[in-house]
Amino acid sequence: MREKSAGELHELAADIETELSKLRRLEQDVLLVHGEITRDPSRAHIFYENLALKLHNFYTGCERILRMVATELNGALPTGFDWHRRLLERFSVEREGRPALLSTTTAQHLQEYLAFRHIVRNLYGFELDSARLERLVDNYPSVSSAFDTDVRSFVGWMRRLAAQLENAETSSDS
């Protein structure tokens, strides 16, 4: 883990919390659109592309947080053709003086959203598999909640580390 000051850790924690709040807003939007599909199944095809984009955005937001931590604390993103998958895997294990950011279970569930994001980027909306989309939407609240819980725990660790650094600075100044 790269050495960081207490202030830098607090700033990173604040940036992560900002992203988490955006993900919570997205959750409301996913539920709203899914409600439209449930309310009027005959128009479901109209809403599936919108829902797919929202699930794409969900994983992108999760990955944005992982990228912040990778660049700020780990020092760099993984490289190579499979860097997205490796980034996710790296954060499900303790590494270089930092705890795991994600539980193994959360990381496994996020793999499905990573794979789906790839599909959304490479297919036409009308080619989407509605059954897969429904399964991801059904799992979304629990996966989103688990991600939020895991990340908040990690942010708590960063804030405790920042407090220790501040106490050490105060002690050395005395």
Label the model's feature ranges:
Residues 1-174:
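Solvent-exposed interaction patches of small proteins and small membrane subunits
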